[in-house]
Amino acid sequence: MARRARGTRVLRSVLVAFDPRRQRLRSLHAAFVLAAGVVGASCVPAGAPLVADKLHPCASTEGPTDGYCGGLEVYEDRAAASGRRIRLAIVVLPSVSSDVHADPLVFLAGGPGQAAAQMASQVQPLFRKIQRTRDVVLVDQRGTGKSSPLNCRGGGDSLRDLSEPDTDALEKLRTCLARLPGDPRFYTTNLAMDDLDDVRAFLGYDRINLYGGSYGTRAALVYVRRHGEHVRAIVLDGVAPMDMRLPMYAARDAQRALDRLYDDCWHDGACRAAYPRLAERTRALMARLDANPLRVTMPHPRTGVTEEIEVTSKLAASIVFRALYSPLTASILPSLIERAEHGDFQGLLALAFAGESATDAMSLGMQLSVLCSEDSPRYANEDLVRESLGTLFGTRLFTGQVAACGFWPKGRVDDAYYTPVVSPVPALVLSGELDPVTPPTWGLEVVKHLRNGRHIVMPGTGHGVAATACGNRLVTEFVDRGTAGGLDARCVRAVQRPGFFLTPAGPEPAPVALASAGAGDRR
């Protein structure tokens, strides 16, 4: 193996459906804390000399102070190769070893709309073991972070902003669109991955490893298709392929996760006794809110200021949807639903503010540029209705996105974009058994076309497998080996759903994973 020497807040009512992994970042945070002690901060960045002439040591406002920061200018309109230029923000976390592998790990953020370089301080602990022998590279994708961001923010911190009508949110979005400095047509995934290849060449890497989570898996697959000769291996964590047609299947996939919650509660005797007929009661609560939205007066979960908010079925459904991202937050849902039945919505509404900093960092304009160009042309309203039938969520969470795509500028995407990516590149495909947005079915579909791919389903896990101890070990070993063959995945057998909250004090000591049993390797 080659080696080298040392060297907005989002407008919630518009795009609440594919909200930026609010709950996933909560679970990631736990993994970050656990991983933070793996390598001491006193280690000397061995890979630094090879990037020092192109980047500069990061200031504390740019990224980790042991990293190198900088940028690369590219044309906004890559095909024309003229006109406006945009600067791509780059962070390199150099290897701490004196014997560094020449192929770095490149982190591709999710959303779409998250900024990878902006997340460097959060991401670094997750890949500490990989950073022992490899550089870790993060680039703010065009339209995000500090790379010509297409930021559209709306609302404030008040509770009433949670239930802002679509009409108000869409009007703010139109105003924002008119003021954006960039052309939203040029912020699609194809163009962004060509940017990434320019960054690869600029930094002097011949081959790279890719880690993509959620939308980042789509980006990784696109890079493999367009620049596969420069890819050593890829990790796809929570697969969102090009033909996913967001949010066409979102209600169906979320309902699957909610049904697993109901089943797991029923199979756990204590949960079944505490919350009998949970599915029936949840639907009854939504029906009540459909017929008569409630005006609730309560302290703001963060500020403590007493405010009034209208609780609609759409707001309640959106909170349930987001809570399902993480089994930890999902474990408290039965208790919060029971409280809401009796008119106490404080706990449920508090979940709406979980992971708020992640939401604020999301670029809504870039998100729309991707979804409206790549996904919305592939479905009609009747498709959304058909796929949402019989679900708790229906189409109510997605009406804002559909309306926004009616006026948002769209980039060019040809039909070939939606064909499966066929590649011999070694691939580790990870799916959370309880994932409400990128369930294992999507990973199973993608791995069929990856000749050297392996699909592992993590039981008791939601959106984001690498945040678990077992998942993190699998990612680290796979990147080190460069092949999924022979990878020991027995640790998945010990992963279980967290116990349900039976009292405000928390769950019973023993976790439950009864309906989630049987996960593991899936081809």
Give each language-model segment a name.
Residues 299-318, 325-328, 357-365:
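Structural motif
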Residues 332, 355-356, 400:
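Intrinsic disorder and flexible/low-complexity segments
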Residues 346-375, 379:
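Long, low-complexity segments enriched in small/aliphatic residues
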Residues 30-41:
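Bacterial N-terminal signal peptides
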Residues 324-338, 342, 377-382, 413:
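Short helix-capping/linker segments at secondary-structure and domain boundaries
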Residues 45-315, 369-523:
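Gly/Pro-rich cap/lid or specificity-loop segments adjacent to the active site
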Residues 7-14, 18-32:
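Bacterial N-terminal signal peptides that target proteins for export
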